[in-house]
Amino acid sequence: MSQLNGPARFRQLLKKPGYIQALGVWDPLSARVCESMGVECVHIGGYQAGVGTAISEPLMTLTELAMLCHYVTAAVKIPVFVDAGTGFGEPLHVMRAVRELERTGIAGLHIEDQIFPKRAHYHKYVEHTVSCEEMVDKIKYAVAAKTNPDFVIMGRTDCMATSGFAEGVRRANAYLEAGAEMIMCFPNNDEEMKLEIGRAHV
């Protein structure tokens, strides 16, 4: 059940009203269970991939993630979205990561503005991020690397916990201007979440 048209199917989901419920999966079986329950899209999260392989997200290689993506997309027909972490390095590394992961049949991926190697200090409420300018370059390289126009590049900012809501919004808009089509960010509370939803650009 090869998912050769994952990006196109994801685009169709985006046209529907309401939210897309992309359940988190960590292997082909969990993805197939979701599909059997009527879920329309699944998401391979970095933490889930690390735990599912008993490796830990910061230690996973691009090769290991690409292999996991291949197995998952081969097991289901629904679109698969993937957490590509920091893109495995500098902008050129991001470009290669996008090319390798796109070949697996996934619908798209998101890259984040944390440093590489990633620290994953979520439990300490600390995020180590690169400059906005460096992340903008990564987004541009990611967009340039994709071969399928339907393939979705999402930008993610993790800076709100340490740099504040306003900086997160500034970065999100910068990533959109750099070519990202979607944004993932993490407001610190419900009030910030409401502000985020109320903004047209983010």
Question: Where in this protein do the model-derived segments appear?
Answer:
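Alpha/beta enzyme core
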Residues: S2-R199
